[in-house]
UniProtKB/Swiss-Prot annotation:
Transmembrane segments: none annotated. Belongs to the UPF0125 (RnfH) family. It comes from the Bacteria. PANTHER family: UPF0125 PROTEIN RATB. This is Protein RnfH. It holds the Pfam family Ub-RnfH. InterPro entries: Mopterin_synth/thiamin_S_b, RnfH, RnfH_sf.
């Protein structure tokens, strides 16, 4: 089955389609996507993940067409940084 795995930084957005077997977890899809190697700052013990904008545990079983999103931690000064842009 095909699922998406997405990660975004302020300057780069990546969305990969990954072919995974039935019963694959969010963690397994992220690992298969190659994003952990591409973005070494991703720490699955720190970064939250979700499916279509809803936070979920890493062991959540995926369905065909799900989009797994890896969220960056909120920076305490994010609001100030946004105003500077």
């Amino acid at each position: 089955m095909i699922v998406g795995v997405a990660y975004a930084k302020p300057t780069v957005q990546v969305w990969k389609h990954v072919d995974v077997p039935e019963g694959t977890s969010a963690r397994e899809a992220i690992e298969r996507s190659g994003l952990l190697a591409q973005f070494p700052e991703i720490d699955l013990e720190v970064n939250k993940v979700g499916i279509f904008g809803a936070i979920c545990p890493l062991d959540r079983t995926l369905a065909e067409g799900d989009r797994v999103e890896i969220y960056r931690p909120i920076h305490p000064e994010a609001e100030l940084l946004e105003k500077k842009r």
